[in-house]
Amino acid sequence: MAERLLVTALKGGKNTKILTLNGKRITKMPSTLEKLPNLKTLDLQNNSISKVCPELRTLTQLTLLNLGNNHLQEVPEEIKYLTSLKNLHLFGNRICRIAPGVFNGLHRLIMLNLNDNRLTSLPQEIGRLRSLTYLSLNRNNLTVIPKELCSLEHLSELHLNYNQIVYIPEEIKFLKNLQQLFLVRNNIEELPEEICHLEKLRVLDIAGNVIQIFPAGFQNLRLTEFYCEGNPLFLKRPFFAVQPKDLWTLREIAARFVLSLLEENDPLIMNVIESYPEVKDKLSKAKKCSICRKPFLTEWLECVYFVAPSKNWKISRNLKLIPVQTSVCSYQCFDQRDPDVFGIAQE
């Protein structure tokens, strides 16, 4: 059957636009593909192909390539020559490696499916897929989201379910067009504040992680769907505790003093700081107290308040209150807090 389909395609020569060899028990990609220079769609899914043929690189008009459910062990170098490619399916293989430079020529790629493989990391070159709108890497062995991925300005849908990801980089704020983010069953402990900058985000699924609290401003996201079941969220169970006195390190005292002068636009301090880029970088990470609005650097009180999820959100069952993080600079400010703000008990 496969041979007959291939013969038919070859008879069409330059006029052949589509070749489908889905589930034909093929173990080797046909080298005669070079005789189909105007091929647009090549479907080779559900076979036993372990290596692509060199002739694949001649299919420069190809817009869709499906090699899903085969035996590939890497994303092959030949793919980088498919400069017209828009859709690439490599799901269900044994891929543990992406050949160097393979993404360099795929400037038109809008959809990439690498589900069900064995990837432990992604190359920096992932950031060169500038047209990508859909990326799916479910059920791999990823531990990190590379910051280069966050430069994909057109990305609207990102699937990273069932990996081993521990944290989300703050650079996620650059995914301005992201509408759907799926992070089910990872090892994520917290979401960065920068996720609250994703104005177009509508669907967020973080079920089955180890998140206890959400960043300040999280409740203002314009979500339509939010799922967080299977996370050990903080519960509203207040109890009385004795408050110690504020004891700051000399470094924190100095940092707060300098930060206060910077807020006043003190010209002398501003000029001095410009001469010390490392100090400037550290001070740029300062936060503000939610009570007095004064800046602090490395020492503060972690607090939580509870808000009801938006009525516009489709949410996990039984989610009544969302624990949202807030920071207080001192016990003095903590005493002036809103009654709905609680300190977080330290074990």
Swiss-Prot record:
Gene3D superfamilies from the UniProt entry: Ribonuclease Inhibitor
SMART domains in alphabetical order: LRR_BAC (SM00364), LRR_TYP (SM00369)
InterPro entries per the UniProt record, alphabetical: Leu-rich_rpt (IPR001611), Leu-rich_rpt_typical-subtyp (IPR003591), LRR_dom_sf (IPR032675), LRR_domain-containing (IPR050216), LRR_R13L4/SHOC2-like (IPR055414)
Keywords: Leucine-rich repeat, Repeat
Pfam family, one: LRR_8
LRR repeat ranges per the UniProt record: 15-37, 38-60, 61-82, 84-105, 108-129, 131-152, 154-175, 177-198, 200-222
Coiled-coil regions, chain positions: none
The keyword Repeat belongs to this UniProt entry's keyword annotation: yes
Disulfide bond entries: none
Top-level lineage group: Eukaryota
Keyword Repeat listed: yes
Family to which the UniProt record says this protein belongs: Belongs to the LRRC69 family.
Protein name: Leucine-rich repeat-containing protein 69
Phylogenetic lineage: Eukaryota, Metazoa, Chordata, Craniata, Vertebrata
